[in-house]
Regions:
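Glycine-rich phosphate-binding active-site loops on the catalytic face of alpha/beta enzymes
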Residues: 30-39, 78-90, 133-156
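N-terminal active-site wall of soluble small-molecule enzyme domains
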Residues: 1-46
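Active-site beta-loop-alpha junctions enriched in small/polar residues
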Residues: 11-15, 35, 59-61, 82, ...
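Hydrophobic faces of well-ordered beta-strands that scaffold small-molecule active sites
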Residues: 6-10, 28-32, 54-58, 77-79, ...
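Alpha/beta catalytic cores of nucleotide-metabolism and tRNA/nucleoside-modifying enzymes
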Residues: 104, 108-118, 123-172
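Catalytic cores of alpha/beta
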Residues: 16-24, 61-74, 120-138
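Glycine/Thr-rich beta-alpha phosphate-binding loop at enzyme active sites
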Residues: 60, 70-111, 149-152, 156
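Alpha-helix-loop-beta-strand connector modules within alpha/beta enzyme cores
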Residues: 1-8, 46-55, 59, 95-116, ...
């Protein structure tokens, strides 16, 4: 399809049986939801031969402790800041505290190499707060980059860059 690395967020049931249909590349990030399968570790294992970065997505209501048993299987966590389904939602207030809990868990369990991606209502203000907490990948959408008209997209990207939101290298 493309040589550009993709960030694939799979919101599908039993994703482990569908990976071969997608065309996953070594440079891709693939996020599966904790709730999408009864066999989370197996699903993450099935991703390993593709050589991609394996991320686990957790919804706002998913407790942080579910990460404890999968940290050895993942390269990153996709922390949803809104309930999945549609653009334009406001951030779920408890997710800022949840981001702090995730960072604390990673440190406590000696897994600081696991990166945290945040998705949902990533406004300029929220991106700055989440960067301070420790998030390193930001899914920018209608709250930042795609605000306003098409001519303004470049300026919106510059505004995010101005926040000095730097992506941690996940290849280390």
């Amino acid at each position: 399809l493309t040589s550009i690395p993709l960030d694939l967020h799979l919101m599908i049931k039993d994703p482990e049986y569908k990976f071969q249909w997608i065309g996953i590349q070594e440079t891709d990030i693939v996020s599966i939801h904790y709730e999408s399968t009864f066999q989370v570790q197996r699903a993450l294992d099935y991703l390993q031969p593709f050589g991609c970065k394996r991320f686990l997505a957790i919804n706002p209501a998913t407790p942080v402790y579910v990460l404890e048993e999968v940290l050895d299987y993942i390269d990153g966590i996709n922390l949803l800041m809104v309930n999945p389904g549609f653009a334009g939602q406001k951030i779920v207030p408890s997710t800022m505290k949840k981001a702090e809990k995730v960072m604390h868990l990673l440190k406590e369990m000696h897994h600081e190499e696991v990166v945290v991606e945040v998705d949902g209502n990533i406004s300029y203000e929220n991106a700055a707060k989440l960067r301070k907490i420790g998030a390193s990948i930001f899914v920018a959408g209608s709250s930042s980059v795609f605000r306003g008209d098409v001519c303004g997209y470049g300026n919106n990207i510059k505004k995010l860059r101005f926040l000095k939101v730097e992506q941690k290298n996940i290849d280390d």
